[in-house]
Amino acid sequence: RRLLRDLNIKINQVIPEGGSVKDLKNLPKAWFNLVPYREVGLMTAMYLEKKFGMPYVSTTPMGVVDMAECIQQIQRSVNTLAPTSSNKKVDYEPYIDEQTRFV
């Protein structure tokens, strides 16, 4: 959650944590899915991609290299799916640099 908060990304749902069957109807409202642990949620993310065309990021943001890769994948997803009317592209490279500079 902290990573998404730092990137100014609003979280739609955290499944299964605190989720209910009633909340499942909101899943397709997300621009993409983040699957931080492939053992939990990957099959659901694959289903949502197939059913709703919703991309997912499944790189675990643990360690310098994988955290940077995960953030870059998130950046690509957001920039691809952002409303075309905004013309604003996000650039998370400064955040990646800040998080990995002294490691």
Curated annotation (Swiss-Prot):
Entry's Gene Ontology BP terms: light-independent chlorophyll biosynthetic process; photosynthesis
Annotated pathway: Porphyrin-containing compound metabolism; chlorophyll biosynthesis (light-independent)
Subcellular localization: Plastid, Chloroplast
Top-rank EC class of the record's enzyme: oxidoreductase
GO CC terms of this entry: chloroplast
Cofactor note: Binds 1 [4Fe-4S] cluster per heterodimer. The cluster is bound at the heterodimer interface by residues from both subunits.
Domain of life the protein comes from: Eukaryota
A single MF term (Gene Ontology): 4 iron, 4 sulfur cluster binding
SUPFAM superfamilies (UniProt xref): Helical backbone' metal receptor
The UniProt record lists the keyword Oxidoreductase: yes
Protein keywords: 4Fe-4S, ATP-binding, Chlorophyll biosynthesis, Chloroplast, Iron, Iron-sulfur, Metal-binding, Nucleotide-binding, Oxidoreductase, Photosynthesis, Plastid
Assembly with partners or alone: Protochlorophyllide reductase is composed of three subunits; ChlL, ChlN and ChlB. Forms a heterotetramer of two ChlB and two ChlN subunits.
Entry's family note: Belongs to the ChlB/BchB/BchZ family.
UniProt function note: Component of the dark-operative protochlorophyllide reductase (DPOR) that uses Mg-ATP and reduced ferredoxin to reduce ring D of protochlorophyllide (Pchlide) to form chlorophyllide a (Chlide). This reaction is light-independent. The NB-protein (ChlN-ChlB) is the catalytic component of the complex.
Name of the protein in its database record: Light-independent protochlorophyllide reductase subunit B
